[in-house]
Structure formats: structure tokens, C-alpha cells
Regions:
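Helix-loop-helix hairpin linking two adjacent transmembrane segments in secondary transporters
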Residues: 145-191
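C-terminal transmembrane helical hairpin of 12-TM major facilitator-type secondary transporters
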Residues: 284-330
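Extracytoplasmic gate region of multi-pass secondary transporters
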Residues: 34-35, 218-272
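Conserved MFS/SLC helix-loop-helix module at the cytosolic interface between two early adjacent transmembrane helices
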Residues: 65-103
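A late C-terminal transmembrane helix in Major Facilitator Superfamily
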Residues: 338-373
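Juxtamembrane intracellular "pre-TM" segments in multi-pass secondary transporters
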Residues: 2-9, 191-223
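Helix-to-loop junctions at the C-terminal end of transmembrane segments
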Residues: 66-78, 271-284, 370
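Cytoplasmic helix-loop-helix junction between adjacent transmembrane helices
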Residues: 110-148
Length: 403
């Protein structure tokens, strides 16, 4: 009987994980479509570089603020509705964006709205996985949709290569609408079968106990710092990677773009590396994160002394891999571990909000810092960020149990 139970748990986890992973892939295709089609849009004269920068900033901040708001709402509303309607409304906004390209204000509003609706997905995804699977399967399911997010960038790039930019946004819109509809249907079916049950394994904090205090007891401050430093590397550093390849390593623009695509494709395996190493370390999350940050710190320091272009790229990948592994384990292990508090979506949305605000700020600072202190100085700053990760990961307090 126990064996049959385990098989049933695994099957249910696979169903949930697959549905969430495919849904999140649609989210990241949509998120990265503007970046992937920037060259086409510029050549077509649809938007200027200034317009594209404004669009990117509007999206970035609406997504970040939306994570905070929708994370809180996600603990009050069924994940089925948050995820499904978030995907559907984002799909409508993507379609409107390409249709309103000749009307800048309407285009800005529709694209910004897309960011807000896409922020409805991640917190509820984490919540539904955490509350309906065991901790081991929750980690593996979370890794599955983290992997989906990492392959979203090259997938968006592939779509952009194959079709014109307006069509690319229509493809993105179609995938969001399709996945939103499928999620609504599939979640309803899984609810009827008892595979998804709202509030499973949740132990609500006593009414007289402050929710902030509950999260403080679960190391939310530590993971706030981790979210900040990994968010900067995951988003801002990776964003400036093509410029680094072109200016510091002297690759041509075309070669830098190709290498960037290759590097981001390699980084897609990060979530797999994170979960396997976590398992190998006997599911000791604190030790795993400490090792990841230590590797990343050493790699960034080494980067300043490696002059050979190919070796330099390899060391850069190692540095990014270490940081992204720590980031992946935070989303796939720490956030689901809050299933018994009833605050999974709130905490996830908060951490994502902090991550993106930090990345937005850093992305604006980095080009000025590069001009002031050069690439070597900027690399030293990146190493310093990872060293902060090492410091907060040291066992100052009792280790957080993995299970």
C-alpha cells in the first residue's frame, strides 16, 4: 500500500508540475518577446530606442508591483482563477500591443498591463504546488517551471527569427490565451478528482500572531537579501552580457548576440543542477546555497585574471551558474516550504518584487559604473554581491530543516 501511495503522489506531482511548467513557459515567452524582436521593431520604425526603453521600464515596474499585489491576493483567491485569468488577460494585452503599435500611449498601456497580469502567475503556481504535493515533489515541480522560465528566452528568440515582430506578438498572445483556457479546464478537472485542494497542509497562524512575525521566524530577511543579490545577477548582469562580450572581449555584435543565446541556453540547465546537487547534499538547503554563492564569488574574482576569451566566457558561465543555482533553490525549495503558513503566495510575490526592483535599479547603475570604474571594477562589484550572499548563508542560526 505505501508503494501504491508513493506512485500516486508521484503521478499527481507530474501532472501538476507539467501543467505549471508549460504555463510558465508561455509566461516567459511573452516576457522576452520585446527583447527578442527589438531589432525588427527598430528596423521597421515602429518604435524608437527611447520608446523601447520606456516600454521595457513600464513593463518591468508593473510586473514588479504586480508581484507584490498579486502575491497577497493569491493567498485569498483560488490559484485556478489567478493563473488562468492572468494568462488570458495577458494574452489579450499582447494582442492589443501589436495592434496599437501606431498609437504609442495605447501601446504603452497595453504592454504595461501585460506585465501586471503576468505577475498573477508565479505566486499562485508556487502555492498550488506547495499545498498539494509533499516537500520533495514540491521542490522537483518548482524546478520544472523554473527550467521553463530559463528556456523561455531562447524560445522567444526562435519565434522572432521565424516570423515578423507583429506576428511574433500574436503567437505569444495565442499561446497565453490557449494556456489560460487549458489551465482553467485542467484545474477544474483536477479539483474534481481531488488532486488539487485549496488550503491542503495549511496551518493558519493564530489570529493574534502577526503575519510578518511568522515570516521573520522563517528566515524571510535572509532570503530577502538572497533575492536581491541573485535578482541583480539573474536579470541585470545577464542583460548586460552581450555588451560585456562585445566591449570587453571584443567580439563582433553578431558573434556577441550568438554567444549570448548560447550562454542563456546553457544556463537553462541551472535548475536541474540545483536540484541534483541539493539532493546530493542530503537536502541541506543552507549548505547548498552557501556552496553556490562561494563558487560564484570565486568565479567572478577569477574572471578578472582570465584574459583568454573562451576561458573567460566559461568562467563567467560558472559565476552565473552559481548565483542562478542559489536563486533556483530559493524559489523551488524555500518558497514551497512555507506551505504550512498560508503565506506561500504572499512571500513569493514579495521576494519576486524585491528581486525585480533591485535588478531594475542595478541595470540603470551598471552602465554608469562601467564608464567610471571599467569592466574590471564592475566585475569586482559583482563578486562583492556574491560575497554578501556567502555572508548571509553562513550558519549564524540553526539550519532550516529541508523537510
Amino acid at each position: 500500500m505505501p508503494r501504491l501511495t508513493i506512485k500516486k503522489e508521484a503521478r499527481n506531482a507530474i501532472l501538476l508540475g507539467a501543467m505549471c511548467a508549460i504555463s510558465y513557459l508561455a509566461v516567459y515567452i511573452a516576457r522576452n518577446m520585446l527583447t527578442a524582436t527589438t531589432t525588427q521593431i527598430r528596423e521597421a520604425g515602429a518604435f524608437t530606442d527611447g520608446d523601447l526603453g520606456t516600454l521595457s521600464s513600464i513593463y518591468f515596474y508593473t510586473y514588479a508591483v504586480g508581484q507584490l499585489i498579486n502575491g497577497f491576493i493569491g493567498d485569498k483567491v483560488k490559484p485556478k482563477y489567478m493563473i488562468s485569468f492572468g494568462l488570458i488577460f495577458a494574452g489579450v494585452c499582447n494582442a492589443l500591443f501589436s495592434a496599437f503599435a501606431n498609437y504609442p500611449i495605447a501601446a504603452f498601456i497595453s504592454y504595461g498591463s501585460s506585465g501586471f497580469f503576468l505577475s498573477m502567475i508565479y505566486g499562485p503556481l508556487t502555492k498550488v504546488i506547495a499545498e498539494n504535493t509533499t516537500p520533495v515533489y514540491a521542490t522537483r515541480c518548482s524546478v520544472a517551471y523554473t527550467f521553463s522560465s530559463l528556456i523561455g528566452t531562447p524560445t522567444a528568440g526562435l519565434v522572432a527569427v521565424l516570423v515578423a515582430w507583429r506576428v511574433a506578438f500574436q503567437v505569444s498572445a495565442g499561446s497565453l490565451l490557449l494556456m489560460g483556457t487549458m489551465c482553467l479546464i485542467c484545474f477544474t478537472i483536477l479539483e474534481k478528482k481531488g488532486i488539487i485542494r485549496s488550503g491542503t497542509n495549511v496551518i493558519r497562524p493564530p489570529k493574534n500572531k502577526n503575519k510578518v512575525k511568522v515570516l521573520l521566524e522563517r528566515q524571510i530577511l535572509k532570503f530577502t537579501v538572497i533575492s536581491v543579490v541573485t535578482g541583480i545577477v539573474r536579470t541585470a548582469v545577464v542583460f548586460w552580457l552581450p555588451t560585456y562580450l562585445e566591449q570587453h572581449l571584443h567580439f563582433s555584435p553578431d558573434s556577441a548576440t550568438l554567444l549570448f543565446t548560447l550562454c542563456t541556453s546553457i544556463l537553462a540547465v541551472t535548475s536541474i543542477v540545483a536540484v541534483f546537487s541539493y539532493e546530493a547534499l542530503k537536502r541541506n538547503m543552507d549548505l547548498a546555497i552557501l556552496i553556490y554563492f562561494s563558487v560564484s564569488t570565486c568565479a567572478f574574482v577569477l574572471l578578472m585574471f582570465v584574459t583568454h576569451s573562451v576561458l573567460n566566457i566559461a568562467v563567467m558561465l560558472l559565476a552565473l551558474l552559481g548565483s542562478t543555482c542559489a536563486d533556483s533553490l530559493m524559489w523551488s525549495r524555500y518558497c514551497p516550504s512555507l506551505y504550512d503558513t498560508g503565506l506561500t503566495s504572499t512571500a513569493t510575490g514579495y521576494l519576486d518584487f524585491i528581486s525585480y526592483v533591485a535588478a531594475a535599479t542595478a541595470s540603470n547603475i551598471f552602465p554608469h559604473a562601467k564608464d567610471a570604474i571599467g569592466w574590471t571594477g564592475l566585475i569586482l562589484v559583482w563578486a562583492g554581491l556574491m560575497l554578501i550572499g556567502v555572508m548571509v548563508s553562513l550558519p549564524w542560526k540553526k539550519k532550516l530543516a529541508a523537510e
